[in-house]
């Protein structure tokens, strides 16, 4: 569990490390592509976050406004966010196993 960490906005340069966290947390059938993460950074830059322990990315959050209908399909890019969003959709929140239990996910949310 990290002793100290910071949370900041996700940047395109973070995607490679985000993919490593994703692979450490989820089964192969749920993994999403670098293009998906780049897309979410483009359409919702203020609500895509990462947690860092020093220089190491230990967790991330992808969230954005959405309508209450069906969630977006797995690993599909979005052209834009819905204009009449009525829900805050947490697409993904993941923390490396070694960093779990220290409040990282709560800080991201």
For each predicted feature, which ranges?
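Conserved acyl-donor/pantetheine-binding loop and adjacent beta-alpha core of acyl/acetyltransferases
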Residues: 61-93, 100
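Short loop/turn motifs at secondary-structure junctions and domain boundaries
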Residues: 39-44
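Conserved acetyl-CoA-binding loop-helix of GNAT-fold acetyltransferases
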Residues: 95, 101-109
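Glycine-rich phosphate/pyrophosphate-binding loop shared by adenosine-nucleotide-utilizing enzymes
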Residues: 5, 56-60, 88
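Helix-loop element at the rim of GNAT/NAT acetyltransferase active sites that forms part
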Residues: 9, 20-35
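A short beta-loop-alpha structural element at the N-terminal edge
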Residues: 5-18
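Hydrophobic adenine-recognition pocket in adenosine-nucleotide-binding enzymes
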Residues: 10, 93-95
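Conserved beta-hairpin
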Residues: 47-61
